[in-house]
Amino acid sequence: MDERPPEISGSLLTIGDEILLGDILNGNARHIALELRNRGFRLDRMITVGDREEDIVSSLVLCLADARFIIVTGGLGPTDDDRTNAAVSRAFDRPLVADEAYVGRLKERLAERGQAWSNEVAKMAELPAGAVKIGLDMAGFFIDHGNVPCYFLPGVPGEMKFLLAEVVIPDLARRFPLRGAYLKEVVRVQGMVESEVNRRLRDLDCRRIGVEIGYLPQGSENWVTLFAVAASEEECRTRIEKVREEVVARLGEKHISGRNDECLEKVVGERLRERGWRMAAAESCTGGLLSTRLTSIAGSSDYFDRAFITYSNQAKQDHLGVSEEMLRVHGAVSEPVALAMAEGACRGARVEVALGITGIAGPAGGSAEKPVGTVCIACVTPKEKRVEKHRFEGVRESIRQSAAQAALLLLWRVLTDDSNLHCR
């Protein structure tokens, strides 16, 4: 196959005590890995260290041993715990030298804000000898060390993303030109655990076709990722289509909800639009999460009419027509009440489709009969009524998110079964 040699791979080093302490998620690492992969590059190593200079030095030395390129984020600021510049100076054996252009720009910015120059700010402009400043209005520099391009980016996500897109990836593409094309596709799988997905696809000989396959759980979904590098985009697409057909055949078309960015809320919206149906949502424990997801899709006003956030029993009676007797006999968290909520939303909004959600998100409110995590979901269409009862585990927010996802999945199943329309 005509493709970039497989040894062109790099290392990523993310720096910050706040990551190791769990104060923030390492979103920078995820973003960088995805952007590189989507452009035909690969990471063979990903390291996260705290702010201790010795740890940064040893990690840089390790990366230099075999990486074809290195990306580092964090530790470029003016505070005492920003030690990346000093660590690079030691690891690369390059003295720190003031970058006069950067010094001038920093002084201009401070003057604009009415702030004085300080040793702390001056530290930001002391770069390892031979470093090339990137992003004059933000921290960041580049070093070509022994023919290994090394990119040092700020930890601030917005600044990191800008420099990655505008400087790093274009420079990597120039240094390591892709001989051909690359293509990635995600197949979204519903209603099947990751282990079962893997079992059904285990002996699928993708490499013979020239496609790499991966598995990624995403909440209640499982993503099957297909990646191809070939002489042309058409050849990439042909290879991926061949593997995708086998993936769908082995998993079953009823489990495939979409591809790439075709999230459930987008897919169900397309189904509703195709049928000419409008919908409403009646939410209790989710408090609007379901409606937020449905209306996050551009053009959702074509099919989404309104939401009823009926948290209390009285609200369920007043706005959805749920009877006091039903609430007394079955309780607010029950399949009959979920169905009554959906039916009431249909009547109140004068729409064809509605979802009703009621549950116990916790941490209090559970019982032996209805423990925390119990959620009842109903879907009503002109052709059928369907109700499900779930028991989700986790903290309050994860239960609420799981309930909203389960409601979307129920709606997708109902609309798919009804219309016999499947992922293309």
Curated annotation (Swiss-Prot):
<dbReference type="InterPro" id="IPR041424">
    <property type="entry name" value="CinA_KH"/>
</dbReference>
<comment type="similarity">
    <text>Belongs to the CinA family.</text>
</comment>
<dbReference type="InterPro" id="IPR008136">
    <property type="entry name" value="CinA_C"/>
</dbReference>
<dbReference type="Pfam" id="PF18146">
    <property type="entry name" value="CinA_KH"/>
</dbReference>
<dbReference type="InterPro" id="IPR008135">
    <property type="entry name" value="Competence-induced_CinA"/>
</dbReference>
<dbReference type="Pfam" id="PF02464">
    <property type="entry name" value="CinA"/>
</dbReference>
<dbReference type="Pfam" id="PF00994">
    <property type="entry name" value="MoCF_biosynth"/>
</dbReference>
<protein>
    <recommendedName>
        <fullName>CinA-like protein</fullName>
    </recommendedName>
</protein>
<dbReference type="InterPro" id="IPR001453">
    <property type="entry name" value="MoaB/Mog_dom"/>
</dbReference>
<dbReference type="InterPro" id="IPR036653">
    <property type="entry name" value="CinA-like_C"/>
</dbReference>
<dbReference type="InterPro" id="IPR050101">
    <property type="entry name" value="CinA"/>
</dbReference>
<dbReference type="InterPro" id="IPR036425">
    <property type="entry name" value="MoaB/Mog-like_dom_sf"/>
</dbReference>
